[in-house]
Amino acid sequence: MKKSLSILSILLGISASAQVNVAATAGTATATYTTVKGAFDAINAGTHQGVINITITANTNETATAALNRSTGNSSFTSVSLKPAAGVTATITNATTAGPVFRILGSNVTIDGSNNGTDSRNLSIVNGFATGSVVVTMGSSDAANPLSNVTLKNTTIINGVKTAGSGIIVSNTAGAQSAGYFNNIRLENNSIQRSYQGIYMIATSLVGNGAGSVITKNDISASGENSNRLMGIYLGGTDGVTVSANKIGNFDTANNESKRGIWLAVNTMNSTVSDNIIDNIGVNNLAGGSATGIQIFTNAGAGNVPSANKILRNKITNLFSSGLNSSVTGISLGGSTVGTVISQNTINNLLNTKGGSSTGLGAEGITLNTGTASNTLVSNNFISKVSSFGASFSGSTGGILINAGSGYKVYNNSVYLTETQNDGTSKGLPIALSITSVTATAAIDLRNNIFVTNLADSSVPAYATSIYFSTLFANTDPKVIFSNFDNNIFYSSSNLAILSVTTTPTVLTNITELQTTYGSNANSLRALPKFVSDTNLHITETSESLEIDNKGVALTEVPTDIDGTTRNETTPDIGADEFTVATMAVNDGANRSKIQVYPNPVNDVLTVSSDKKVSNISVYNVGGQLISEVNHSNVINLTKLSSGVYFVKTVVEGKVEMTKVIKK
């Protein structure tokens, strides 16, 4: 019996000692350890050198932070890699001491959680400590020796609590949320759970600091007990970081705080934030709280270099708040930020339900609130289903809200608002484009946009656009704030536009009044585009869209649309979608069905003959402009039309046919 127990003890000892295997090309070639800390300590002491590979064969319980120091002094390595053995799924846990599980201070390090060379996540790194925990930190406090070429990928990172701390911090040697020095850091395909902040990257503001770093394909959207709480990804002071294809959302909703999917903070520059999905972020706390998909508040970068951040092709959906003094914003641009591009983003389902007052609280798809000469381009964005109780012109429901500043180019955006909040006491004020407190001459260049507010609730006032000046700027002429203002489509189920500088605003009901009051817009239209749906703002490529086809002006800054489709070089479409109306529906007389249009050519009255009831006849010129229409009649008088070619659209029991007609 004693012999059996002795053998068992030996076997268990061998198993325990084989949890972490180390192989090196210099120094001690191979060794085994019970913890990653043991392996890192040996590397720091110079026991293993050269190219070092660490293989995890079973779970480990770390008793303190596993810190890998810089290769200097006794430590001498070319590179270090850590990964689970083939076929092994393992967990590395530290539940006994404060501090991170891993602290990476040495360059040329790769932690890959896949056990088969793919994107599978087979390694979990867990901090089970109860207070203020962090899972992985990395960085340098030495400007002459920045941390570089570190990759952390294919892992599951679980923090001990979500009341404080982060899943991953990239900063300085101490691993605190203080600025450090680093470049070429890659954080890829990690699942980050139960954190206060998912990824926190902060650099000392210096040209090139952070360059080449990539945060991509991470999942920060766990729900339930393992949900994250405050913020998905934070960048501060970095230069040249890419944040792409991350999934962020499902945050804890209980606390009164400002939640953000992605935050570009002070001195962040030359970043590209693209193709991220931000979904289901909000606050259910009556005391307050706000939700923002992407916030850019960077000011100028190092050496006053323009921040030049790009926000591209992100999908931001289902943001909400129900609290006092709360706000909901898809993309928020503020500070003295310069050179930002916000393009090809899709923003929908933003909801602020705090009501019960005369003004309510707002929600906006995109908010622009920078300083002067911001050189900001906002183009090719879809914004829809934004709703709130905001009822003042400075705090309404806005598709795009330009709140202050200048240097804005707002081109080819599509905004479609269809909902508002109305509890019988408070009502929202939906405005597709809202301009407030902008007074600088030629501050805004506004062309090729679609601004539509189309509500089913007729008791709620709604506007396609508004301009608001506080009493301090009551004498400002709205015409002076635009450098260009034309080739836009406006539509509202209530009034088209409003100018508010006093307690009695000026309501504008048609394009002529808008042209007179706002200025320009000679080529703008009042029309209701036929979108695919309330949240899919692609234009239906049918004859119903002829009226708005090819009505834009060519702009060099917008060569493609929201999908990357090349735009017409001379007469592009208005809005974010470049579309082509199908021409095969045109009936030139050779392929007539049971619908007959005659006489053709016509002098005066045109008749539509059909065995079904005709619900609509519309006449368009060759440019697609609606000239005349009648409903529930099979004749239309064309006497006053000039001679030429026209297209007649007939609608019979929902079926549409286009016929080319010659007017004598």
Regions found by a protein language model. Give the residues of each.
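Bacterial Sec-dependent N-terminal signal peptides
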Residues: 1-21, 583-586, 600, 654, ...
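Acidic Gly/Asp/Thr-rich repetitive segments characteristic of extracellular carbohydrate-active
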Residues: 22-56, 63, 101-103, 514, ...
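Acidic glycine-/aspartate-rich tracts in secreted/extracellular proteins
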Residues: 46-47, 58-63, 85-89, 115-118, ...
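Extracellular beta-strand-rich solenoid/capping regions of secreted or surface-exposed proteins
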Residues: 63-81, 89-112, 126-148, 162-177, ...
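Short glycine/acidic-rich loop motifs that flank beta-strands on beta-rich extracellular proteins
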Residues: 65, 96-99, 127-135, 157-168, ...
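Right-handed parallel beta-helix
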Residues: 107-121, 148-159, 179-196, 209-225, ...
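C-terminal accessory segments
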Residues: 479, 489, 512-578
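C-terminal outer-membrane/trafficking sorting elements
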Residues: 587-664
